[in-house]
């Protein structure tokens, strides 16, 4: 049924991208966009998940597809991601701004990843994980404390310097620390 609908839509308008299933269950059949969803918190959990998806994405892979169907080289896109503040499985006291920063940093490290869709622009009742407060005022993400002048816009810029390291670590006096940097272009 999904394949028939995909092909019918393709026949009606061959100029548009068509997604067969918005893949929250890793259940693509035939699609122009290889997408997936996730709502995770914690640097290591998020990093492992994103890297697993990227590593398993290549033409011929059956990852993210069902029924014997395989990837055909369609662009990889995270079509739904967000934070878990105020919803079941809440991250509790985790910091929205820093989780968002390391989520986007991890996305920007992945050359195969063509983009993402963040699901909540504004806070809503019982979910406080948007870019803006429920009254539409700006949130202070605090990035200027990390790097003078940095704002949320810097994470969305076409070019960004991403860091391939945990969001924080302890370095003792006299120790040397290296941080691999990657120039990301979206």
Model-found features: residue ranges?
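Active-site neighborhood of glycoside hydrolase catalytic domains
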Residues: 1-33, 73
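Histidine- and/or cysteine-centered catalytic micro-motif in compact active-site loops
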Residues: 23, 39, 81
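Substrate-binding clefts and catalytic carboxylate motifs of secreted carbohydrate-active enzymes
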Residues: 28-31, 42-186
């Amino acid at each position: 049924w999904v394949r028939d609908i995909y092909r019918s839509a393709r026949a009606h308008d061959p100029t548009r991208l068509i997604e067969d299933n918005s893949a929250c269950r890793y259940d693509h059949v035939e699609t122009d966009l290889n997408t997936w969803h996730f709502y995770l918190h914690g640097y290591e959990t998020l990093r492992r998940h994103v890297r697993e998806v990227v590593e398993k994405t290549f033409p011929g892979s059956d990852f993210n597809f069902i029924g014997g169907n395989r990837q055909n080289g369609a662009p990889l896109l995270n079509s739904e991601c967000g934070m878990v503040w105020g919803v079941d499985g809440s991250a509790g006291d985790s910091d929205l701004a820093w989780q968002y920063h390391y989520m986007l940093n991890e996305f920007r490290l992945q050359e195969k990843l063509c983009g993402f869709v963040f699901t909540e622009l504004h806070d809503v009742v019982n979910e406080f994980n948007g870019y803006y407060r429920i009254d539409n005022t700006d949130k202070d993400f605090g990035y200027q404390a990390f790097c003078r002048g940095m704002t949320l816009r810097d994470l969305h810029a076409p070019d960004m310097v991403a860091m391939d390291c945990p969001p924080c670590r302890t370095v003792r006096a006299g120790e040397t620390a290296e941080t691999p940097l990657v120039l990301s272009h979206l």
